[in-house]
Amino acid sequence: LVTSFSEIDKNINKDELIENTEQFLKEKAVYHTMLKAAEDISAGDVDTYVILDKFEKSCNISLVTDLGLGVKSNIDDIIADLTTVEDKIPSTWEWLDDALDGGFLQAGKSLYVFAGETNIGKSIFLGNIASNIARQGKNVLLITLEMSELLYARRICTNISKIPMKEMAVNGSSLRAAITESSGNIYIKEFPPSTITPNTIKAFAKKFTDQGIKLDAIVIDYLNLIHSPIGNNSYERIKNVTEQVRAISYVFNCPIISATQLNRAGFDQDNPDLATISESIGLAATADVIMSIFQNDEDRDLGIIRLGMMKNRYGPRGMTQPMRIDYSTLTIEQADDIDLEEDDSMLNTLAGLSRTVQ
């Protein structure tokens, strides 16, 4: 039956169809088991063992026939896979791409998260990632739960055109030329915060595949503003949201890049760790890569913002990299001319001299 449906509509995701069909059959089986149990109880025929057995069978319905990978029987496939190079989508920041072994996984099945304190620039990083991916001729869906579509579009336009945001209004022709000549496309969709679930995002993204548009990346600003009907506390809700969002990358075979907040302990901290992620350590356990964004007062004055690797399933972690940020065009670039130790030492010396003078 599932195969028949997939032959009718080539855009149907077979795994998702099996999952939904399986869920439907389970719900129907449980419903009919409840009705039968009620009838038996009314007739005075109560056998709790039989009732429990029927409920367990109903809940254990499975349409999965694939037994997985047999290490012995599939050794040739395993050996062949050792030399397979997975396609990546570069972030265009050399430090990050090296850490990710080439960039974001093009086939998806991965969730990348930027973590930072309030107003540190998480949306600026997400906007830069969206622009950098689109410049490679890719289609990017950007879900915004905090800013309006037009405000986000302004940020994207100033980044792509390199026309300062304050000057775009008087440079309409140059702006139009820069945007129309750029490769790829970015689709920005705004939803009110805390009103949509991961399923809402999945249903919306499906509209693109229904129209024959392959999404190469999905950017979500940001995870904590997605609603979860499941969970009695913030830990359970954020954990569920993160798991469901990561699952979307399997459905559309593209990476998902998002952001999250740091808690108070992570504010003004150099190179914050996973313990400073706000609300739920479940997010840290689920995401494949988590990058910290941090900046001190001296950095801000010098137009520097730092990126740290908090968690990385695809490479090393624990290192940091200074980035240059141009606030006039909201452009972030790797700062290779800055030596971390030497720069930090200089900044600390200047800060000490400043305190002495005061």
For the regions a language model picked out, list residue spans one by one.
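Amphipathic alpha-helical transducer elements in NTP-driven molecular machines
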Residues: 11, 27, 90-93, 150, ...
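Structural recognition of the conserved hydrophobic beta-strand(s) that form the central parallel beta-sheet
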Residues: 255-260
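Cytosolic-facing regulatory segments adjacent to core modules
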Residues: 97, 102, 132-214, 228, ...
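Walker B catalytic acidic pair
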Residues: 222
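Noncatalytic partner-interaction/assembly domains of nucleic-acid and motor enzyme complexes
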Residues: 1-24, 357-358
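Conserved ATPase-coupling elements of RecA-like P-loop NTPase cores
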Residues: 227-234
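C-terminal regions of RecA-like/P-loop NTPase motor modules
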Residues: 199-218, 232, 244, 250-252, ...
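The Walker A/P-loop phosphate-binding site
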Residues: 63-163, 176, 186-188, 351-357
